[in-house]
From Swiss-Prot:
An example Gene Ontology CC term for this record: small ribosomal subunit
Organism: Shewanella denitrificans (strain OS217 / ATCC BAA-1090 / DSM 15013)
Keyword rRNA-binding tagged: yes
Record's function text: Binds directly to 16S ribosomal RNA.
Name of the protein described by the UniProt record: Small ribosomal subunit protein bS20
Length: 88
């Protein structure tokens, strides 16, 4: 338990940030799941549109430090590879 005034403030700020990050992480996962669902359905157009919507979100979360930039690049590359395989 925080005893000093500054420790209490830090605890409050930490909890606030945790909840904010959890919300953003959930949003990120939702966008990625939409792309995966479109890929599994086999609809190339829907998958492409979902990927176009998810791509800036993934990049933004990497910029904000929510996920590592390499993870963002890896996610985008893997999803894009699967979408290209649908077209072939």
């Amino acid at each position: 338990m925080a005893n000093s005034k500054s420790a209490k403030k830090r605890a409050l700020q930490s909890e606030k940030r945790r909840q904010h990050n959890a919300s953003r992480r959930s949003m990120l996962r939702t966008y990625v799941k939409k792309v995966i669902a479109a890929i599994k359905s086999g609809d190339h157009k829907a998958a492409t549109e979902a990927f176009a919507a998810a791509q800036p979100i993934v990049d933004r979360m990497a910029t904000k430090g929510l996920i590592h930039k390499n993870k963002a690049a890896r996610q985008k590359a893997r999803l894009n590879t699967k979408i290209k395989a649908l077209a072939a």
